[in-house]
């Protein structure tokens, strides 16, 4: 029977794989590179140690950033102006720009983007 840490680590790894699939959907080269890097990082930290919970938490945070904050752009080769088309999917975090509207006043941040 697998330990709870191993189960949590596998779950975090699967979260990263799903997040890379969403973030790099039409970019096979970057998708493969991101997955290889994730595999390399998990292989480097294969043995359970004191910092294992921190490593698992880091993996979950990476997955969240990939899923919610990475937007890829594709340059339109037919357009002489070189316009870019952004691939914004349903999981992308969209801000409301309230801090821009404040205009010189101090802005209180209630929570970080990853929360």
Curated annotation (Swiss-Prot):
Principal location: mitochondrion
Keyword set includes Mitochondrion: yes
Segment annotated as transit peptide: 1-36
Gene Ontology BP annotations: mitochondrial respiratory chain complex III assembly
Keyword Chaperone (UniProt): yes
InterPro entries: Complex1_LYR_LYRM7 (IPR045298), MZM1/LYRM7 (IPR050435)
Ranges where the record places region Disordered: 95-115
Localization (cell): Mitochondrion matrix
MF terms (GO), sorted A to Z: protein folding chaperone
CDD domains given in the database record: Complex1_LYR_LYRM7
Keywords in alphabetical order: Chaperone, Mitochondrion, Transit peptide
One cellular component (GO) term of this entry: mitochondrial matrix
Cited function: Assembly factor required for Rieske Fe-S protein RIP1 incorporation into the cytochrome b-c1 (CIII) complex. Functions as a chaperone, binding to this subunit within the mitochondrial matrix and stabilizing it prior to its translocation and insertion into the late CIII dimeric intermediate within the mitochondrial inner membrane. Modulates the mitochondrial matrix zinc pool.
Name of the protein in its database record: Mitochondrial zinc maintenance protein 1, mitochondrial
Gene expressing this chain: MZM1
